[in-house]
């Protein structure tokens, strides 16, 4: 049985997380920054044009339990923030315009 488009998208997100996570299934700060630079160049470029350094505190903001690692649920929270920004962009807002960042 083939996966639906949304099921495939979720599988792709899991694979992306695993690409940057370590053997303990968490992402460390340097790897999160690399993930962001590798996978969100347009978003980060929009932030830069607006004078916002999105990466400067993203790790600390997303590390909810303060263990200095990003687990999968914290990763999903980060993606939700970015997806919300893209959703707002679809309604005319500029990328990286605030909100959950």
UniProtKB/Swiss-Prot annotation:
GO biological process terms, alphabetically, are: endothelial cell migration
Keyword flag Kinase: no
Q: Which residues form a coiled coil?
A: none
Domain EF-hand, by residue range, is 8-42, 50-85
Provide the Gene Ontology terms for cellular component.
cytoplasm; extracellular region
Q: Which domain of life is it from?
A: Eukaryota
Q: Which Gene3D superfamilies match?
A: EF-hand (1.10.238.10)
Q: Which UniProt keywords apply?
A: Acetylation, Allergen, Calcium, Cytoplasm, Metal-binding, Repeat, Secreted, Zinc
* InterPro entries the UniProt entry points to: EF-hand-dom_pair (IPR011992), EF_Hand_1_Ca_BS (IPR018247), EF_hand_dom (IPR002048), S-100_dom (IPR034325), S100/CaBP7/8-like_CS (IPR001751), S100_Ca-bd_sub (IPR013787)
- Per UniProt, Ca(2+) binds at 63, 65, 67, 69, 74
Q: How does it assemble?
A: Interacts with RANBP9.
What name has this protein been given in UniProt? Protein S100-A7
Query: Which organism does this sequence originate in?
Result: Bos taurus
Please name the gene that encodes this protein.
S100A7
């Amino acid at each position: 049985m083939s996966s639906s488009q949304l099921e495939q998208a979720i599988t792709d997100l899991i694979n992306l997380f695993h690409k940057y996570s370590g053997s303990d299934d968490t992402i460390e700060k340097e790897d999160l920054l690399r993930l962001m630079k590798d996978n969100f160049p347009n978003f980060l470029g929009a932030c830069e044009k607006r004078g916002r350094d999105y990466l400067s505190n993203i790790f600390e903001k997303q590390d909810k339990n303060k263990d200095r690692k990003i687990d999968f649920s914290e990763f999903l929270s980060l993606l939700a923030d970015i997806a919300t920004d893209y959703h707002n962009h679809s309604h005319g807002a500029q990328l990286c315009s605030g909100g959950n960042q």
